[in-house]
Amino acid sequence: SFAAWPLFLVKLQPLWNLSNFSVGWVSGAYFIGYVFATPVLVGLTDRYDAKYIYIFSTLIAAVGAFGFAMTAQGFWSAAFCWGLVGAGLAGTYMPGLQILNARLDDDHRLRLLPYYTSAFGIGTGLSFFVMGWLYSYANWTSAFIYAGLSSLSAGLLVSAVIRPQPVKNESDSPRRHPLDFRPAFRNAAAMRYI
């Protein structure tokens, strides 16, 4: 779904009479959804198996894409739905990495994680290819439905292939709320990356 809005905005901008400013905000809604959902969804992987966060997030992305196809009629509805798709990405990329971290030993992790991280770029390229093809041969509604189906397919694949893994709790550290970011803000080394 990554490339659905960037490609189809050319058709939707005149259809919905959107200004360039509005088009930019709809585009940005994806990343706003991503930024706000990332700390929540990634933080939840400390308490819950990342597999379930991933599957839940593919559902969020699918709801956003299907919502776009069926309800988007202008700026607000498009921005809301596209923001949901961005939130879905937040719960698939890093939790997907956590799925591997929790299931691989150090040796396999070092060998396989570069392939996982490069898959994002490959997937983005494929998204532009598929959406470009749909741009030529289908309407925007069909493209967003296809994007939603793709998200559901990813969730079903992970559900079928990845075995559940209990989260290892560190017994010597106190259990904190997943949205309590104070420990990160107090960690100077971590703040350099934030």
Where would I find each of the regions flagged by the language model?
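Juxtamembrane intracellular "pre-TM" segments in multi-pass secondary transporters
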Residues: 166-193
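Helix-loop-helix hairpin linking two adjacent transmembrane segments in secondary transporters
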Residues: 116-162
